[in-house]
């Protein structure tokens, strides 16, 4: 009985660990389409510092600043990952 309970517990832990790891590996997307209604020079970005790394390996202060650069570059700059580069 103890072996069955231990095995069940082990399987449960392995299942939840593998599920959360798979979820964290899914690529995050940044939706820049909400900024297209503004002229690129007048996008109202918040001053909140939540750094993101762009595909040009430049750290942007937040997703809005990344989207501004992405729109300026016609989509060449994309989201790479959260945090500093």
UniProtKB/Swiss-Prot annotation:
The keyword Hydrolase does not apply. Residues 1-19 form the signal peptide. It comes from the Eukaryota. Pfam families: Kazal_1. It is found in: Secreted. SUPFAM superfamilies: Kazal-type serine protease inhibitors. One of its GO terms (biological process) is negative regulation of cytokine production involved in inflammatory response. Residues 26-85 form the Kazal-like domain. The record marks 47-48 as: Reactive bond. InterPro entries: Kazal-type_SerProtInhib, Kazal_dom, Kazal_dom_sf. Keywords: Disulfide bond, Protease inhibitor, Secreted, Serine protease inhibitor, Signal. GO terms for molecular function: serine-type endopeptidase inhibitor activity. Disulfide bonds join 32-67, 45-64, 53-85. This is Serine protease inhibitor Kazal-type 7.
């Amino acid at each position: 009985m103890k072996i069955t309970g231990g095995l069940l517990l082990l399987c449960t832990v392995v299942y939840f660990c593998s599920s959360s790891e798979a979820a964290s590996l899914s690529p995050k997307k940044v939706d820049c389409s909400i900024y297209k209604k503004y002229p690129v020079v007048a996008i109202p970005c918040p001053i909140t510092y939540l750094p993101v790394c762009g595909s040009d390996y430049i750290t942007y202060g937040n997703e809005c600043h990344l989207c501004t650069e992405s729109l300026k570059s016609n989509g060449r700059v994309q989201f790479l990952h959260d945090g500093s580069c």
